Amino acid sequence: MTTAFYPGSFDPMTNGHLDVLVQALNVASKVIVAIGIHPGKKPLFSFEERAELINRSLADALPKKAADISVVSFDNLVVDAARKHGASLLVRGLRDGTDLDYEMQMAGMNRQMAPDIQTLFLPAGTASRPITATLVRQIASMGGNVSAFVPPAVLEALTGKLKDPAK
């Protein structure tokens, strides 16, 4: 049984994240979606909200795979968090050459620290290649339609959050 660790901020989860997760489930028997907690950053959604949105999105998109996916948080090195959860694969999605350059450096450093954990690069599909959570937040905050870029649960939460920032 192979366990994959898919780290990210997922603020919010996008269709690009979902695309990579579906691919990861074709390679690993279990995938841990790991939300990184960075004390210096102010996310739009709290950890609890992001975890709920991920779980709702997965229940809608992949109902038969729900038991194979778990959502956790981490605030330490990715390789240490992956090891703690018994993962032997780190999943990284790639949109373009810029992502590849950055991820190759990270994979090299991770391999030095944890040679027992392999990095698996998964290319984004054509439809999800331009999507970033940052752009989704920017477009949504300016009143743009992001329905093509995020799962329905995320769209609903984004709409509510941006209409009432206290949520």
UniProtKB/Swiss-Prot annotation:
Q: Which InterPro entries match?
A: Cyt_trans-like, PPAT, Rossmann-like_a/b/a_fold
Q: Give the UniProt entry's GO cellular component terms.
A: cytoplasm
**Oligomer status and interactors:** Homohexamer.
Cofactor names from the entry are: Mg(2+)
Gene3D superfamilies assigned: HUPs
For this protein, the record's HAMAP family field holds: PPAT_bact (MF_00151)
Q: What gene codes for this chain? A: coaD
Protein name (database record): Phosphopantetheine adenylyltransferase
